[in-house]
Regions:
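Short coil-to-helix segment of the ABC ATPase nucleotide-binding domain corresponding to the Q-loop/switch region
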Residues: 66-73
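Helix-to-loop junction immediately C-terminal to a conserved catalytic motif
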Residues: 20
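Catalytic Walker B motif of ABC-type/P-loop ATPase nucleotide-binding domains
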Residues: 126-129
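A short, proline-enriched helix->beta-strand linker immediately N-terminal to the Walker B motif
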Residues: 120-124
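Conserved ABC ATPase signature
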Residues: 101-111
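Conserved ABC ATPase "signature" region
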Residues: 35-36, 73, 81-97
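Conserved ABC transporter NBD signature motif
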Residues: 28-36
Length: 199
């Protein structure tokens, strides 16, 4: 788990979009899992995004007319090697809501559906933009615990973009961004579980 920190406008979301193959580079290169994604052609980038990357954005982008289960299945239906639906719903504790619609869920529950949708396709990389930005402290801890569980249970590398310094405590590595540049990249020697964070 990596936490990418920086003030608003520092380039965190741009970095996330470049890692996910959504934005292109002006200079330099990006290598993910031995693959230089900054040199991939459009079709290869689409394949990379579909197979290797899961996205969880600030706005969950759930489809309002689909149930929780259907929102997740939309992604699993196009995935090459999706994880079992029941296993993913259990991992993020949303199985009991599977027949509900997004407007019947709390913000934290919607966030868990978004996480489930991102991980069902079994991505190598899970990119989370301001994962807890609109959530209260208790819900934030629960969502971060689910991300830890996803990392441990499925072996997914996770990058969380945030301006909240406290989240860095749960990370294996912390990257700091300022004015579009990486100003620090450190291993976290004192990693603590998400439920012990003081948010």
């Amino acid at each position: 788990i990596y936490v990418i920190l920086g003030p608003s406008g520092s380039g965190k979301s741009t970095m996330l979009n470049m890692l996910g193959g959504l934005d292109s580079l002006d200079s330099g290169s990006i290598t993910v899992d031995g693959k230089e994604i900054s040199k991939l052609k459009s079709g290869e980038l689409t394949k990379y995004r579909r197979s290797d990357v899961g996205f969880v954005f600030q706005f969950y982008n759930l489809i309002p007319d689909l149930t929780v289960k259907e929102n997740i299945q939309v992604v699993s239906d196009i995935a090459k090697e999706p994880l079992p639906l029941d296993e993913v719903m259990q991992a993020v504790d949303i199985g009991k809501y599977k027949d509900r619609f997004p407007n019947e869920l709390s913000g934290g529950q919607q966030q868990r559906v978004a996480i489930a949708r991102a991980i069902i396709k079994n991505p190598k990389l899970l990119l989370c933009d301001e994962l807890t930005g609109a959530l209260d402290s208790k819900t934030s801890k629960n969502v971060l615990k689910f991300v830890e569980k996803v990392n441990a249970q499925f072996g997914t590398t996770v990058a969380i973009i945030t301006h909240n310094e406290m989240i860095a405590g749960m990370a294996d590595g912390v990257i700091r961004i300022k004015d579009g540049k990486v100003v620090a990249n450190k291993v976290n020697e004192t990693k603590i579980p998400a439920d012990k964070l003081e948010l």
